Every structure is written in C-alpha cells, then in structure tokens.
Amino acid sequence: MLWVIGINHKVEVDIRQKFSLTKTKLQEKLISLKKLADEVIILSTCNRTEIYFFSEEYVDIEKIFTELDWDRRYMPLFYIYKDKDCIKHLFEVVCGFDSLLIGEEQIVAQVKEAKDIAKQVGGKNPVLERLFEVALKCSKEFRTKARLNEHPITIASVVGKVLKESNIRKIAIIGLGNIGFLFCNYFKNSDVDKVFLIGRKNERIDQFVKLYPGKFEYSDKKDAISEAQCLICSTSAPHAVVHKDDIPDGKNLLIFDLAVPRDVDVEVYKLPNVKVIDIDQVHKMDATSREIRISKMQENYNIIEKYIDEFIEWLGFRQYRNLIIEVKRHAEQLCKAQVKYLKNVDSREREEVERLLIRMANLYIDRAIEVLREAHKEGSGEICSNLIKRIFLK
C-alpha cells in the first residue's frame, strides 16, 4: 500500500511549525519510522511536512504521531492520501500545483533532497524512490511544456518587489542556506546598495562576496541589524534567532521571517517601529503573474496524468518480479548444467560458452517479459504469467 500523511500551507504557520523537522531530526525520524513501514520518505519544507509510506499494511496514524512525538490533538488537521491519490498528490506538489506560490520551482530541489536523504539514512526504498524519480521526471517535462520559465516566481522576487516599492537599499540576511543563496542570487543584479550576510561562511555564499565586494559582506548580527533597513530570516534553527535585544531602541525595521519554525521571537512583533512579515503573508503577495501560471498549468495537466498512469503500470507489473527472478535463475542453472557436457575444452573456453548460453537465454526471457508486460496492460497478465511458468519452470 502506498500512502502519505501530511500538513501544508493551508494550516497557519503557528501550528505548522510544531511539525516542522530539522535535517538532524528528520534523519532520526526516518530511522524510527522504518519500524512501522517497509519504506519511508519525509518531505519537510517551510510550507509542508509530509511522510510517504510503502508497506503491505496500512499504519495507524496514532502510531505515527507517537513515534514522532507529535501532539495527537492536531491529527484532524492532517490529510491522508492512498495509492493513486497519493501518487497524484506528489506529482501535483512537485509540479507546483500545491504551492502557495503557484508554479514555484524550489519544491523540485526539495523533493529531490527528500529522496536522497531517505536513501542515505533509511536504506532501500525501491518503490518510493521510483515514485519520486518519476515525479521529478514529470515535473521537468511539465514545466518545460507549460513554459513556466516565462513567468518565473520565487520568494526572492516577491520580497524584492516589496523592497523596491519601499525604496529599501540595505538588507541583512540571516541564514545562508538554500533560501539565503536564492536571495543573494537575486540581489546581485538588483539596485540594492548593501547586503549584510549573517551566518556560517560557505563556498556558495563566498562567491558573491568575492565577485561583488562592494555589495556583499559578512557581518556580525547586531552590527548588520543596526545598519540594515530590512532583515530577511531563513535559518533552519529549531528556535528563535532574532530577539528583542537584537533590535536597537526605536529603530525602523522591516523583517521577513521566512523560516518554519519562526526565526523571530514573538516579542519582536510587539515593537512599535518593527514590521514582521511571515512566510504565509509573503505568499499572499504573489498576484502579478499568478493567473497566467495557473492557466498554463491547467492546459498541460494531461502530462501529469500520463506520468500517473506510467507509475501505476510499473507498480502493478512489479507483482511479477519474483517470477522474473526465478525464471532467470533457473535458466542460468540450465545453461551451467549443459556446459558440463562439453569435452576437449579448457576452463577459459568453457566460461565463454557458459556466458554465451546465458546471454542467449536472457534474450528469450526478455522477450517473454515484454509479452508479459503487454498482457498486463491488456488485463491478461495472470494468464500470461502462468504460461511463462509452464514454459520456463516446468
């Protein structure tokens, strides 16, 4: 059974942040959830926390909440999709249908990262890995055909528009991960005067400091906040990193808190000259090309349907994997047995003949597999598989 349990941007950020997982915590939970299901992948972003499962039996949601130390009172806020609905949901997510910024592209990298982390930490996930790979393949074709690059949208472009309208030219960025990099990449060609970088130095951010030395510079948090007109927060910390004491008395400051959990302490929201805009409010500012993107995406929805059918067909055909393995194993044994009858040949020649026989046998088996695949599509897979058993195994 294939299914997903999740919570997304339709639930307010104050509640959503309770279920957000840091990278370290995510890795820990992947291991613990493997006790409940054969395969697990966790997708955790600022807009959603989703857990994808593949197992022979459905896992009770209460057991999942217990394993994750989540408050069961919030269970009604979570959605659950099974089998085809689960496949459809992931494909819509990676294609941008389920994003607050409709059609945004950052989700593609996040889906890929979720797949990779699960592989590194949780071991083999053959079905879920295939699901995520097909979803990413679908997204690539969908975005190309829908020509979404002609109407790009990112958090950086939405925030940048606000800064331009407010004539803000000095910005501080706290959190130099993927979101921080996205903003640096956006600001390098903008007309802002200064970008103060707060956080651990890394190679990706270093390039901006080296190529644009007058615009980008690393800075201490308090010094940067004192100089800046705007603070952009996007760390992955499990707690607040900007506090009331970090803001000079009476300072006018615009803060974009893009982190989940929040980077900005609640006391900062109460400061009279400080305006804090959270991630959900930023997403609501996207209006310029939203309708155009929605129209283009709906026109190309058939691409998603095509890939859904492709994956369902693959998943259904998977029931024959043990038969295929057994047929190939049996054929190899027969080939090796026949080689024993060869006389007047040395060991090297015997090995070459054995390899040739196995290769020829596999050619016939591969053709039988193709016939089985066609029969499966037509609904007669069981009849065909029984014939293959009679021909190759009896």
Swiss-Prot record:
Pfam families: GlutR_dimer (PF00745), GlutR_N (PF05201), Shikimate_DH (PF01488)
Pathway connected to this protein: Porphyrin-containing compound metabolism; protoporphyrin-IX biosynthesis; 5-aminolevulinate from L-glutamyl-tRNA(Glu): step 1/2
Swiss-Prot/TrEMBL site (Important for activity) positions: H89
Disulfide bridges in this chain: none
Xref: SUPFAM superfamilies: Glutamyl tRNA-reductase catalytic, N-terminal domain, Glutamyl tRNA-reductase dimerization domain, NAD(P)-binding Rossmann-fold domains
Residues that coordinate or bind substrate: T45, C46, N47, R48, S99, E104, E105, Q106, Q110
Active site: C46
HAMAP family assigned to the protein according to its UniProt record, in alphabetical order: Glu_tRNA_reductase
Assembly and oligomerization: Homodimer.
Extra facts: During catalysis, the active site Cys acts as a nucleophile attacking the alpha-carbonyl group of tRNA-bound glutamate with the formation of a thioester intermediate between enzyme and glutamate, and the concomitant release of tRNA(Glu). The thioester intermediate is finally reduced by direct hydride transfer from NADPH, to form the product GSA.
Swiss-Prot/TrEMBL domain comment: Possesses an unusual extended V-shaped dimeric structure with each monomer consisting of three distinct domains arranged along a curved 'spinal' alpha-helix. The N-terminal catalytic domain specifically recognizes the glutamate moiety of the substrate. The second domain is the NADPH-binding domain, and the third C-terminal domain is responsible for dimerization.
NCBIfam families documented for this protein: hemA (TIGR01035)
Identification of the protein by name: Glutamyl-tRNA reductase
Organism: Caldicellulosiruptor saccharolyticus (strain ATCC 43494 / DSM 8903 / Tp8T 6331)
